[in-house]
Structure formats: structure tokens, C-alpha cells
């Protein structure tokens, strides 16, 4: 897997509007990784009083103690900009995420190619089914677990291929030795 030897960040943003000129980022969840090793996590939200949309406010009420809350809607993106400097970003969504993160200099791409999946509305249902994962509000954690599973699967396949190759080599070697000993015994 290409990610095993790279440093990268898996990032999910939840905005107040699908267009960045009409909203702001209400929540950022991100994992900073070196290969498969978790280096750090970034979990920030704006204070509830800054969010006018009650449905959105209710949607992000989970796991309150895990998030750092800020009372300035512009502070979070500045903090993330510093935290993510120099790391490529693997996005969970691209229609609005790139728009909201447009001021960052980081390379950005969707994460799904590393999981041999295509993005779609049901992508997390497919991920949970493919890797036998339990639902979670922390989507970056589901992606991280999926990357680990994918890496393990590729290691298993590589190991099986190596064992198969070694087995074939041993069979060929044994055949040669068997023919040689038959000739010598005549």
C-alpha cells in the first residue's frame, strides 16, 4: 500500500453550508499519521452558539469531551493550517471540503483509492461491510481502521504469494534431486 511509508492526514470537515462563501467550518476531525502509526489527532468544534442551524447543532453533539471548542469561527482553520503544515490531506469528501480548505497549501485527494473503493453516498456503509466495522460518529477513525485492514490484507496476500513461490521452488528442487538420485542409482 502506498500509505505505509508516507506521512499524511485523514481529514473530515463539517461545514455550516455546502458553499464556503455562505458558511464556515463547524467541526474538523483529523488524524496525523506516519505510515500506519497515529502521531496526533485534531478534534475541534465551534461553540454551539455560533451555529444557527439546529439540525447541524444536534448532529455534532456526540462525544463532547473529545473536542476542543473555540468561540471564533476563523480560529479553527488557522489552528488546523499550522497543525497540518507540510502533510498531504486525504479527504472524505471533495465537493465542499476542498473549497473550505482552499487557503491551505497542502496536497489534497480523496482517500478511497487507497481502499479500492469509489466515493458515493453509501461509501461508509460499504466500508463498514467490507472491513466488518461498527458504526462510528468519528469517520476519520473508520477510515484509519480501514487503511490498517487494507494494509494487513495486502501483507497477507504478499506473504501467501511468497510462500507459494517458495513452495514451487522447493518442489522444483526436489524434482531435480529426485531425478539426479535416480540417475545415480542406475
What are these regions (language model features)?
Residues 2-103:
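Conserved non-catalytic scaffold segment of RNase H-like nuclease domains
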Residues 103-114:
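A short alpha->loop->secondary-structure connector
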Residues 161-184:
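Intrinsically disordered, polybasic Lys/Arg-rich low-complexity tracts
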Residues 46-60, 64-67, 112-146:
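Active-site-proximal helix-loop-helix substrate-binding element of RNase H-like nuclease domains
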Residues 85-103, 120-168:
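Acidic, Mg2+-coordinating catalytic module of metal-dependent nucleases/exonucleases
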Residues 1-9, 176-179, 183-186:
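N-terminal accessory regions of nucleic-acid-interacting proteins
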